[in-house]
């Protein structure tokens, strides 16, 4: 999300993150705090477990840890914890109306009500997303690979 926000400063970038993912990369908050992208909204959906890998508890299951406090300490002044839908709506309205970066820590209940069945191919998802950005921004991110004859000629 940060790279996209920095590369496309005229676009609003909203990152949806899970608590497990964020716990494994807390340094991302410090990097966001350092670069201060005005167009970035980072939402952490905290269900207090690694749901995708079996439901083991994350560090936030202790209720002593505060993602919003960590974000503020990392330099993201606009950082909040939301516990209700109304709080989430209010904070999103604020974030959309004001320069960021913004961090929203949303406490949610673990468990899925519907099992999603969809093919998941990380490489295909990457290319699909990049092609969408190329089309909507009118830019080239990925170039076509050079043919063998061009590579040998030093082009």
Predicted regions and their residues:
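Thiamine diphosphate
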Residues: 1-133
């Amino acid at each position: 999300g940060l790279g996209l926000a920095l590369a496309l400063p005229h676009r609003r970038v909203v990152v949806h993150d899970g608590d497990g993912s964020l716990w494994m990369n807390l340094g991302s908050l410090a990097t966001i705090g350092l670069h201060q992208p005005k167009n970035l909204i980072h939402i952490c959906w905290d269900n207090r477990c690694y749901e995708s890998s079996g439901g083991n508890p994350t560090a936030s299951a202790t209720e002593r840890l505060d993602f919003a406090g960590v974000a503020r300490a990392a330099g993201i002044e606009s950082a909040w914890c939301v516990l209700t839908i109304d709080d989430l709506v209010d904070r999103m309205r604020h974030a959309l109306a004001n320069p960021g970066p913004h961090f929203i820590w949303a406490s949610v209940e673990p468990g899925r009500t519907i099992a999603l069945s969809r093919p998941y191919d990380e490489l295909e998802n990457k290319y699909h997303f990049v092609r969408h950005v190329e089309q909507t921004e009118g830019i080239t991110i990925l170039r076509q690979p050079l043919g063998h004859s061009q590579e040998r000629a030093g082009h």
